[in-house]
Structures are given as C-alpha cells and as structure tokens.
A protein has these predicted regions:
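C2 and C2-like phospholipid-binding beta-sandwich domains
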Residues: 5, 18-29, 33-40, 51-77
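Short acidic, glycine-rich loop/turn motifs
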Residues: 10-12, 60
Length: 77
C-alpha cells in the first residue's frame, strides 16, 4: 500500500529556492490532493522560475520513492 504525498519546489534555473508539501495520505492508492500553495515571486522574475511537482511515496524505513514528476515552466527543454 502506498503512503503518497506531493512535494512542490520553486526553482530559478536549476537552483531550488522554496519547498511546499501536502500531508501524507496513509495506506491509499487513490489519494485526492485538494491543496493550494503560494510562493512570493517578484513580477520581473516570473519568467525565470519553474515549479517542480513530485508525487512521492513516504517510507518510514528507507528513502521516499518518486512515483511521478512534472516540471512546470515557461519553456522546458
């Protein structure tokens, strides 16, 4: 059974600036993440930033496992 959560990083280029996370949904395969996050970004820097959104599986013993990921940016290469 999975213990999923979502982690969102605000990035400028390759540099991670700020992180937000959802609560962990214990023992579920069909979580519903109804969350909103806000980041303070100066308007003149908005085109330089991106959001790295990762769905993770929490693990008490070992390393948390990446389930899925998307990078939201003006231009992704």
């Amino acid at each position: 059974m999975l213990d999923p959560y979502v982690k969102v990083w605000l990035q400028f280029g390759e540099k991670r600036i700020e992180k937000r996370k959802t609560p962990i949904f214990n023992c579920t395969l069909n979580p519903v993440f109804n969350e909103s996050f806000s980041f303070n970004v100066p308007w003149e820097k908005i085109r330089e930033c991106s959001l790295d959104v990762m769905v993770m599986d929490f693990d008490n013993i070992g390393r948390n496992e990446l389930i899925g990921r998307i990078l939201l940016a003006e231009a992704c290469n």
